[in-house]
């Protein structure tokens, strides 16, 4: 592994625990601590803890911040409040997804954007470039934050014990600022990337190690990127760079709920997304379950029963929960029918599959 990879504040903890470390988005990250299946099941049935400090943070502040946020994001940012976050897309003029991200409104003129690690610098430069006509300050503050995700059906009860507020009724994407945990001040968000109940903790970078170590004193399993990927794929949640890209729109990528092109305010990519909203997109994302042996890898062709190409696999794995071979794929809209049999071209073999719901969590 090259030595110029970025490291989170927990890198030495990975090394000391014997975690398997890999390169991901320019970072040295743990792919697993024990086994992917063990970590996956900990999140599905108990509590797992992820270091996601590699994610990027971009802050936008100033008199025109509210107006600018709507200009660059595809969702209706008028619905943002000081305690409610929002999932959205940063789109180009063609409606393609530069990145998918979560936005926190810290106050009337101050927003925090959480972006994908590999896209942080690209996003920052793009946002900065488009800010010239607005009175805003755009800052890449990724070095300021640590981020941990505590996920699983028992995570809420545990967090409720450890923080100074009642989280028992916190709804999805609700967040609170200046929450205390282990004597540290954090932003606590009811969110995650696993398909389970859970929370994300944003802390000062220098507090990350202490919070991580104290959380692990409870019945919590440290988890790596391997389980994060199988969990999100079972839940049908997209990964930018595979399921989403600059040539895939929110309507094609299965995140139509994050696009609101019928709102009055203009945003970049709105005209293309409005046409897709009104007329339908030519492609759509589906779930696949393979009926034969093999894993559907990113880029494999999807064919109809007459061997005509109708799309391609964006992500695939063997589900640790069900043992089934599952995938996400983008196919032609006209080829879609729930339960329909299709073929995945796995190297020289053709493997039968069927179209299913994107969320394939089985317990």
Curated annotation (Swiss-Prot):
**Its job:** The glycine cleavage system catalyzes the degradation of glycine.
State the top-level EC class: transferase
Q: What is this protein called?
A: Aminomethyltransferase
Give the organism, scientific name. Answer: Staphylococcus epidermidis (strain ATCC 35984 / DSM 28319 / BCRC 17069 / CCUG 31568 / BM 3577 / RP62A)
A Pfam cross-reference name: GCV_T
EC number(s) in its UniProt entry? 2.1.2.10
Q: Which GO terms describe its cellular component?
A: cytosol; glycine cleavage complex
Range of residues in the leader sequence: none
């Amino acid at each position: 592994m090259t030595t110029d990879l970025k490291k989170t504040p927990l890198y030495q903890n990975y090394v000391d625990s014997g975690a398997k470390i890999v390169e991901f988005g320019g970072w040295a990250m743990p792919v697993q601590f024990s086994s992917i299946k063990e970590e996956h099941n900990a999140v599905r049935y108990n509590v797992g803890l992820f270091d996601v400090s590699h994610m990027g943070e971009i802050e936008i502040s100033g008199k025109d911040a509210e107006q600018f946020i709507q200009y660059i994001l595809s969702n209706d940012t008028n619905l943002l409040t000081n305690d409610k976050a929002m999932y959205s897309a940063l789109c180009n003029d063609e409606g393609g997804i530069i990145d998918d991200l979560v936005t926190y409104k810290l106050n009337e003129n101050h927003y925090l954007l959480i972006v994908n690690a590999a896209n942080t610098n690209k996003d920052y430069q793009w946002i900065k470039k488009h800010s010239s006509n607005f009175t805003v300050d755009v800052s890449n503050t990724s070095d300021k934050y640590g981020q941990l995700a505590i996920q699983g059906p028992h995570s809420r009860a545990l967090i409720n014990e450890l923080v100074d507020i009642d989280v028992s009724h916190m709804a999805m994407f609700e967040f609170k600022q200046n929450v205390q945990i282990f004597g540290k001040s954090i932003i606590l968000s009811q969110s995650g990337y696993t398909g389970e109940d859970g929370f994300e903790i944003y802390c000062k970078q220098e507090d990350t190690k202490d919070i991580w170590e104290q959380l692990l004193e409870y019945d919590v399993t440290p988890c790596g990127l391997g389980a994060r990927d199988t969990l999100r794929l079972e839940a049908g949640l997209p990964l930018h760079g595979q399921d989403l890209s600059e040539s895939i729109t929110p309507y094609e990528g299965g995140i139509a709920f994050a696009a609101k092109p019928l709102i009055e305010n203009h945003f970049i990519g709105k005209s293309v997304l409005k046409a897709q909203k009104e007329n339908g997109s030519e492609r759509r994302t589906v779930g696949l379950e393979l009926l034969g042996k093999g894993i559907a890898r990113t880029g494999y062709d999807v064919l109809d029963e007459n061997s005509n190409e109708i799309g391609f696999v964006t992500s695939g794995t063997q589900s640790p929960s069900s043992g089934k071979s599952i995938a996400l794929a983008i196919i032609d809209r006209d080829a879609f029918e729930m339960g329909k049999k299709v073929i995945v071209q796995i190297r020289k073999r053709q493997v039968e599959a069927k179209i299913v719901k994107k969320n394939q969590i089985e317990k």
